[in-house]
């Protein structure tokens, strides 16, 4: 229920901000880099790098691409997108010191997942850029035994690294299914020559 309400709010926000055009989604290009290196701007930039890669990994797909899986035991591209969507919430929640709740992305289309994931990453990047002391941030979980807080370090080797890894899987899956990512994407520069 909350997942659908959250997505609706993100969608309405995106209509107001971008005129609902896919070309106006965040991360078509990576934002300009900050003028100062701080612990927070470096992590914000890592999130931006993920957002840029995810944008292009999920741009101009076909149904065949979404259904593709390299093995019967593997996740499909669509299922991988669902997983990245969940990871994007963990990154966003950690950037705001909010508790992670299990989210169920059922009933979401690939476009819904893409939109929500990109906006989660954009929001997390913006929040991270404002953090003055990373030691104050934790990745928080609430369960039947109570709340568990882990240091922010776990965001780096956990959901952030995992989301980058799985975005690479989507790129590989697309190549294997015959619809490679746009060859003009330059992940080093964060720009795309169209």
Language-model segments: residues:
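Bacterial Sec-dependent N-terminal signal peptides
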Residues: 1-26
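Stable alpha-helical elements in mature extracytoplasmic
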Residues: 39, 43-46, 50, 54-57, ...
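Short, contiguous alpha-helical
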Residues: 25, 44-45, 55, 65-103, ...
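Alpha-helix boundary/capping residues
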Residues: 61, 84-87, 120, 131
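Acidic/histidine-rich alpha-helical segments that form the ligand environment
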Residues: 109-165
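Surface-exposed helix-capping loop/turn segments at secondary-structure junctions
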Residues: 60-66, 128-137, 175-181
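Short N-terminal segments immediately surrounding and downstream of signal-peptide cleavage
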Residues: 23-42
